[in-house]
Amino acid sequence: MIPLSLRIMPRLSLAIPTCDYHGKGDALLDDLLRTVQIQSFKDFEIVISDHSEDDKIETKVQEFSELFDVKYHRNSNKRGNSPANLNKAISLCTGEIIKIMFQDDFFYDDEAFEKIYYNLAGDVSKSWLLCGTNHTQDDGHNFFWDIFPRFNDNLLDGVNTISSPSVVAFKKDVLVRFDEELIYLMDIDFYYNMRKTHGEPIYYDDVLVTNRIHQDSISSNITNREELLQNESIYCKQKYD
């Protein structure tokens, strides 16, 4: 093993927050890592912050540990808080470019890393990138609903025309993080803050990732959704007023 002091930092870091996902977390992560395995761009690390209480995710990570550089961190802090878990994964990344990916999503394009890295690293005027995404309800057998992220004037009201954080990549020197007080609008708040702090992203209008629509997703299991949306919208507006 190469000592950390001598290790060459990767060009791209993939930040993946994980949890047990009602017992399906390891299978979902397996699907994602298989789409990582076939990426044309190989100069990357995978960073996993795991909120699971069992060992299934860690065991799955070990299966792939000889294929690529993986950092696994068992995170017991604020267990169940998705923004906190994602922030922890980001904090452990060392790459020039940090790519966020949720464990229930996966890469649609085997050149995704290459396209993200060269477009973002090659533009000194931009700090972040939003890529296109599609959706699946049957584990990738069929794909539908392409989204090419754009901002709108009602973003803080919960009108999300950007999609999930799996469409986001940003440069290492970006300090904006996810607000750990939020649940439903954690992504929207981040996008708004990024644009306010770092300006417009690169809008990369090519579908690079797939968002999985399923009953076990975090957004599908939010109770009192309308009340939560209203309260979080007020919180975000006051925050940026």
Positions of predicted regions on the chain:
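Short, well-formed alpha-helical segments that are part of the catalytic scaffolds
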Residues: 21-38
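Conserved nucleotide-sugar donor-binding catalytic segment
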Residues: 14-16, 131, 149-228, 232
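Glycine-rich, basic loop-to-helix element that forms the pyrophosphate-binding segment
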Residues: 76-93
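Short alpha-helix within the catalytic core of nucleotide-sugar-dependent glycosyltransferases
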Residues: 29, 33-34, 58, 87, ...
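Acidic donor-binding segment of Leloir-type glycosyltransferases
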Residues: 33-77
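Short aromatic/hydrophobic "clamp" motif used to bind/position activated sugar donors
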Residues: 98
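Conserved donor NDP-sugar-binding/catalytic core segment of glycosyltransferases
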Residues: 106, 111-143
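Active-site acidic Asp-centered loop
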Residues: 51, 101-103
